[in-house]
Amino acid sequence: MINVSFLGLMSGISVLLKTTVIVVGIFEGSNHLEDNGALEGYNDKIMEIVNGYQSFDGKFAEVLPIIGLEKDFPVVVVIGLGKSEDFDENKALKVGGVIYSELNRMKIPDASIVINTDSNVSANIGYGALLRSFKFDKYFVEKKDKNSVYLNKLVLFSKSEPQEVTALFNDLKAEGESIFLARSFVSEPPNILYPETYAQMIYEELSKVGVTVEVFDEDYMKANQMMALLGVGQGSAKKSRLVVMKWNGGDESESPIAFVGKGVTFDTGGISLKPSKGMWDMKYDMAGSASVVGIMRTLAARKAKVNAVGVVGLVENSVDGNAQRPSDVVISMSGQTIEVLNTDAEGRLVLADALWYTQEMFTPKLMVDLATLTGAVVVALGNNQYAGLFSNDDAIANQLIVAGNESGEKLWRLPLDEAYDKLIDSSIADMQNISTKGYGADSITAAQFLQRFVNGVPWVHLDIAGMAWDYEGTEICPKGATGFGVRLLNRFVSKYYESH
C-alpha cells in the first residue's frame, strides 16, 4: 500500500524540489495551473509548454509529462481535471488513481501533487491513489515488470490545514484497507480459501480491529435446521461454516444494522454443472461475503458510532456421490420447504437460511444482503455499471441509491411484485428455487425467493454479480476483484445511521 501524506501549499517550492516528480492539475480550457502559487516563478514557463501541445487541453485524466524544465528541476506531470464545475469527490478519487497508474508506469519512486482544492477533495485524491495501488501478487515467484510496484510515496500539497486533510484521509484509509482485504479474499484461489480457512481468516483479520467474531460449524447449523444452506455444501469435502461478526459502537439500546453475505467459495454449479469455459471465475462467488467482512472491518477501524452485525454463510458447491440432486426437497430454518430444481441456483439457498438466522438472533432494524446471485442482472445492467437493488422498503432503498451515487458505487432498483410469486410456486413444496414457467426475470424471481425469508424486517437485496470483478480495471481498481459494496455501505451507514 502506497504511503500518502499531506503538507500545506505554503510549504513552497523548496520542499517540492526535493521530490522526483511534481504533479500539478489544470482545468479544461484554463490558462493557469491549480497550484495556488506553490510553483511561483515556474507557472508561466510550464503553461507555455502546455499551450504548445494542441492535443492537450486539460480534459479529464489527460496526462502531459514535462521533462527538463530547468537543470535539476523535478519532472513535471500536468494532469487534466476536466471542467471545473464537474470536479467533485468522485472525480478527485479517479484523478488520484490515474496519477498513481501513470507514475508507477513511469517507474517513479516518489512524487508530490499540487492541486488547489479543499480538504475533502485533497483527501480523495490521495485515497484514489491508494485504492489504485492494490496488488495481489503473492503467488508470483518472480515479479514480472508489469506487476512491479515502483511508486511508494506521495505527498499532497493542499490549501487546507494538513492536520484536517490527514484526519479525513485516515478515515478513508481505514475503509481502503478493508477494501484491500475484501479484494484479497476474492482473489484467493479456492484451494487456499474454502469455508474452513476463510472463516479462520475472517476471525484473525477482524479480531485485530475489535470486531467480535464467532465461527459456527455444521453441527450448529443442523441444530438450527439450516438445511437449505447445508444442502449446498453437502457434495464437497470442505465443511460449511457460518460466521457472525459484531461491532457495538452505538448505544446499547439500539438495534443493529445487519449485513448478510453469500459466501460460495467455489461454485461448480453442482450436479447442474456449469460449462468449463469461465468456471475459473467462480472463485469470486463469495464476493458478497467479502463485502460484508469489509464493511464490518471499516466500521470497527474508524470506531463508527453504530451497532452492526455481519452474517456470512460459507459453502463450496461441488460434486460427489452425496451432492444435492435436482428435485431434492430441503427444509429451511424458517420451516418452509424448497424444491431444488437447479443446484446452480445455490446462492439463494445459502441466503435463505442466513437471512432467517440474522432476524431470529439479532432483531435488526434493517438488513442488507449482498450476493453475486444471478447472471441475469449482468444481462440487464452490464458489467461494472450498476448493481441491482431490490427492497421491501422505499425509504431505505432510496437512501442506498443516494449513497451509491455519492460513493460512485451505483445501484439500479428493480421490481419486487407478488405477480412474480407464481413463477416460483412448486407443485410439491412451499416453493422451488428457480422459475420453470417461461423465460426471463431471473434476477427478480431470485429476489422474490429471498423475500419469502424476510419476516417483517426492512430489507434490501443487492445483486452484485456484475460488480464484483472487473476484467479491464478502472481508474481506482486494477483488473480483478473490486471490493464493491464497502464504500457504498460505509457511506450509507455514516450518512443515515451513525450518531455524530
UniProtKB/Swiss-Prot annotation:
Where located?
Cytoplasm
**Carries keyword Cytoplasm?**
yes
Q: Which positions are annotated as binding Mn(2+) 1?
A: D267, D344, E346
- The identity of this protein, by name, is Probable cytosol aminopeptidase
Residues reported in the UniProt entry to bind Mn(2+) 2: K262, D267, D285, E346
One GO biological process term is:
proteolysis
Cross-referenced InterPro entries, in alphabetical order? Leucine_aapep/pepB (IPR011356), Macro_dom-like (IPR043472), Peptidase_M17_C (IPR000819), Peptidase_M17_leu_NH2_pept (IPR023042), Peptidase_M17_N (IPR008283)
Q: Which organism is it from?
A: Ehrlichia ruminantium (strain Welgevonden)
| Catalytic activity, EC | 3.4.11.1, 3.4.11.10
